[in-house]
Amino acid sequence: MGNTWHFLIAEADFPENGKLAARIGGWHVLVGRTEDGLFAVNDRCTHQAALLSAGKIRRGTVMCPLHGARFDMETGRCIGAAYADLRTFALRIEQGGIEISVPDTPPGFDEAPVIPGAPLP
């Protein structure tokens, strides 16, 4: 299977706080604005499956709100800890809109965040 591009939001409407969490094609996606542009990553810490969108984006990284694990928004690489890297998603601006490319298959258990009260994938 491949990937499919999905419209997310008009670039002009992107939140001023620099981040937006969305469910796209079954994937939990975090789009963040850094000094280098917009980037999209799986909205799930690889350490304990927390939603990274509840954390802060600073200096090109997103920090997990649970234990402070940091991930590079552009590459998904975990910085300063021995946790697995994040999945990244291709992002493009088309006719003023932000589009994200996600796999056609939904995420497995190991890539879905833990959300209290939500059913498992």
Locations of regions flagged by a protein language model:
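N-terminal pre-ligand scaffold of iron-sulfur
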Residues: M1-R59, F89-P121
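Short cysteine clusters
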Residues: C45, C64-H67
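Short cysteine/histidine-rich metal-coordination sites, predominantly Zn2+-binding motifs
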Residues: R59-P65, I79-R87
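Short, basic/low-complexity N-terminal boundary segments at the transition from targeting/disordered tails
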Residues: M1-I9, L66-R77
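Iron-sulfur (Fe-S) cluster-binding segments and ferredoxin-like electron-carrier domains
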Residues: L51-R58, R70-G80
